[in-house]
Amino acid sequence: MSLLTLIAGVAVGVTVVPRIVARRQRRAAYAAGMTVSQMLQHITSLSPMGVAVVDTFNDVVYSNDRAVELNVVRDRILDDRAWQAAQRVFETGQDVEVDLSPLKVANPGRSGISVRGKVRLLTDDDRRFAVVYIDDQSEHARMEATRRDFVANVSHELKTPVGAMSVLAEALLASADDPDTVRRFAEKMVAESHRLADMIGELIELSRLQGAERLPDLDAVDVDSIVSEAVSRHKVAADNSQISITTDAPTGYRVLGDEGLLVTAIANLVSNAIAYSPNGTDVSISRRKRGGNIEIAVTDRGIGIAKDDQERVFERFFRVDKARSRATGGTGLGLAIVKHVAANHNGSIRLWSQPGTGSTFTLSIPEYPDPESHSDEREDQRER
């Protein structure tokens, strides 16, 4: 009996023990997770930077998806420019940087596509393999191009009033004995100084809206109040041009926003409408609720905007009619500020215009959530 028991125990051990060992190995593997090799491959495959490893025969032995997306690796063959850089690396052992932007792009910064590559040996002791790191710098290139344009535009725009003030000051000195001439030149200097101050103020406001400075906390803002304040800011200018500003009836609408910024945005739209309207015409402002947003529309009966210019009117310093804008003291920044105010309020600005008929700019801002209206809706649903 004891012999049979021993034999049975051995048989069970031979059958069960391997299963237990295998189960423990599986548990250990699960607890350990992926191997280091698997982890590294996963990291490179998810990297926002393209990575490719090439040998001395121009055979790509490894590449991640990003390298293919950026068109540096095609059918396991490296881009010619990257391969030429790799050959220099194989010969010298020194790192090489290379421009891998699409060849058809004449100006990468303006087109929005800019790709840079850096090639280096995989290891210093083995010159059989080189690694190509591919960096999509398109966003940086676009920002740099925008910065250059902005600096150029600011320099040009500031030069005009500063130059005018310099000329007027010289004329003022030369006319010291003529009071009427002195007064005329002095009035022009004051106008140019005001224009310069307005431009600097709007540049500061635009930089604040675009920059990292924290915006004020958004709160409930009465739409009727901001419309009334915006109109009052430009009533004198409208009266001087015999332009009538009409508004629809008060609505009681409220939006989620910053009152000062919203007044600035509406005031800029009103100012723009007055500047581009003939004397004796009307500018109208209307309000309506659409979905979860409140829309404020400013309509003029002015010169209108050509289709090709409608996409550009929100660019900094862009003017549809430069002569008219300078005559009215415009800075070319008003609509750019409106665009950024809308974006910072999770809203939008859209334009309808027809040359010779006029234009309508519509600012759309999320409505302020009214707890009472929501509770009423819930009560109605319960009653149903």
Curated annotation (Swiss-Prot):
It is a peripheral membrane protein. The keyword ATP-binding applies. Residues 153-369 form the Histidine kinase domain. It is an enzyme of class 2 (transferase). Residues 371-384 have a biased composition (Basic and acidic residues). It catalyses: ATP + protein L-histidine = ADP + protein N-phospho-L-histidine. The modification Phosphohistidine is found at H156. InterPro entries: 2-comp_sensor_kinase, HATPase_C_sf, His_kinase_dom, HisK_dim/P_dom, HisK_dim/P_sf, Sig_transdc_His_kin-like_C. The keyword Thylakoid does not apply. Keywords: ATP-binding, Cell membrane, Kinase, Membrane, Nucleotide-binding, Phosphoprotein, Stress response, Transferase, Two-component regulatory system. Disruption phenotype: Deletion mutant does not exhibit detectable PhoA activity, even under growth conditions where Pi is the limiting nutrient. SenX3-regX3 deletion mutant is more sensitive to phosphate limitation, showing a reduced ability to grow at lower phosphate concentrations. The M.tuberculosis operon can functionally complement the growth phenotype in M.smegmatis under phosphate-replete conditions, but not under low phosphate conditions. GO terms for cellular component: plasma membrane. It comes from the Bacteria. Its EC number is 2.7.13.3. It is found in: Cell membrane. Induction: By phosphate-limiting growth conditions. One of its GO terms (molecular function) is phosphoprotein phosphatase activity. GO terms for biological process: cellular response to phosphate starvation. Autophosphorylated. Residues 360-384 are annotated as: Disordered. Member of the two-component regulatory system SenX3/RegX3 involved in stress response. The system is involved in phosphate starvation response. Probably exhibits a dual role as a phosphatase or a phosphodonor for the response regulator RegX3, depending upon phosphate availability. When environmental phosphate is abundant, SenX3 is required to maintain RegX3 in an unphosphorylated state, where it is unable to bind target DNA. Under conditions of phosphate limitation, SenX3 autophosphorylates and then transfers the phosphate group to RegX3. This is Sensor-like histidine kinase SenX3.
